[in-house]
Each structure stands twice: as structure tokens, then as C-alpha cells.
């Protein structure tokens, strides 16, 4: 027969619970039979595993909160930088279009200037 990993995990937890109950019953028997030895028995807090009550957990939690805050701020800064890069790219495209349009206007003005110079040269040559 095969057991899934979930069955094995729940079986282990049940086994620990049973051992804890048996150990607690033994402690109660010792207390009722030998009250003098009750001082040597472990307290209930010593037998229950401390889940999340270790001395460094407060610092660790604070560290993770700080780390999360730093990561959030850095993510916001990255998004802001990407936004600025996109905006700058759009503005550069606008400037490039304007320069191209002005370049065409300048070329047209040069052609008109050349036509005027040719016409003036023709008029000057006719007068001479």
C-alpha cells in the first residue's frame, strides 16, 4: 500500500499529538504520585514547540517588512524611470519630425533662392 505525502504528513502530526498526550498523562501521574518531584518536571511551555516565538523572530519580521518596503520603493522608481524613458522617446520623435519638416522647408527655400538668383543673373546679363 502506498501513502501520499499528505497522508504521511498528517500521520506524523497525529503521532506527535499522541506522544504529547501520553507524555502529559505521565506527567500528571508523576504529580499525583510524587508531589516532591513535580519541581523537576518540564512545564507545559517547554513541551510545546515554539512556533514563531523565538527571540529573533521580531527582528526577522522587521527585516522582512523593511525589505518589502525597499523592494516596493525600488519597483516604483523603476516604473518611473521606464515612464520617463518612454516620454523622452516620444518627445525625441516629435523633435525629429519637426526637424525633418523644417529641413524640407529649408530645402524649398534654397530652391526658391536659387531660382531668384538665376533670374537676377538673367536680368543682369540682359541689361549688360
UniProtKB/Swiss-Prot annotation:
One CC-aspect GO term: membrane
Principal location listed in the UniProt entry: membrane
Record-listed Phosphoserine modification sites: 24
Transmembrane spans: 66-86
Coiled-coil stretches noted in the UniProt entry, renumbered to this chain: 90-111
Source species, domain of life: Eukaryota
Subcellular location: Membrane
Membrane topology label: Single-pass membrane protein
Matches recorded under InterPro entries: DUF4577 (IPR028099)
UniProt KW keywords: Coiled coil, Membrane, Phosphoprotein, Transmembrane, Transmembrane helix
Protein name stated in the entry: Leucine-rich single-pass membrane protein 1
Species annotation: Mus musculus (Mouse)
Gene expressing this chain: Lsmem1
